[in-house]
A protein has these predicted regions:
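Alpha-helical transmembrane bundles and membrane-interface segments of multipass inner-membrane proteins
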Residues: 1-185
Length: 185
């Protein structure tokens, strides 16, 4: 039993962190709904960050707002699938494990809102650049998780390219070395 737990320690830690992130998401949303009225905006950092309380009846950035069942179904399937993949232990690289944990936490955090409230509570508004969307902690988790996957894929592509280049250079050097040996004979 100890070896089995030890073999999945990263996954266990990731799930604990994911649960804490879901809690943080729900606590921050609760603080906003308890202390703000709908539509209220408060400057947190001038020209950088506002807290603006809105209801988002759709998915990310308000898409699918007239078809919540579609997004609820997709989210449930995605979260269950991610949990199965994580539990399988087949995700070898830690960045992917952490990315899955972040996506799970974001999906669960927003799913709790959709199922209990029929909308998602959003409140984080970036004002230092033009970004017309208001979002929440769960959205941040999903975006960061997806960003980690993209970054890891790019890193792996670069490593694979360098590895292939090194193999070609070695093969060329071996051919040159063999040719020189044949000339010497």
């Amino acid at each position: 039993m100890k070896n089995r737990i030890k073999g999945h320690l990263t996954e266990i830690i990731v799930l604990v962190v994911a649960a804490l992130l879901v809690a943080a998401d729900q606590i921050t949303k609760g603080l906003i709904t308890d202390n703000f009225y709908l539509g209220q905006s408060v400057t947190v950092i001038p020209n950088a960050l506002n807290f603006t309380y809105i209801h988002n009846p759709g998915a990310v950035f308000g898409i699918l707002k007239n078809h919540p069942w579609v997004f609820n179904t997709v989210t449930i399937i995605a979260v269950i699938g991610a949990l199965i993949v994580l539990a399988s232990g087949r995700v070898g690289k830690k960045p992917y494990i952490w990315a899955i944990g972040l996506v799970i936490s974001g999906g669960v955090g927003n799913m709790i809102d959709r199922l209990s409230l029929k909308y998602v509570v959003d409140f984080i508004e970036i004002t230092f650049i033009y970004f017309p969307y208001v979002f929440n902690v769960a959205d941040c988790c999903v975006v960061i998780g997806c960003g980690i996957v993209i970054l890891q894929v790019v890193i792996e592509m670069i490593q694979e390219f360098k590895s292939k280049k090194a193999k070609k250079a070695k093969k060329a050097a071996d051919i040159t070395h063999l040719t020189e040996e044949n000339v010497d004979e």
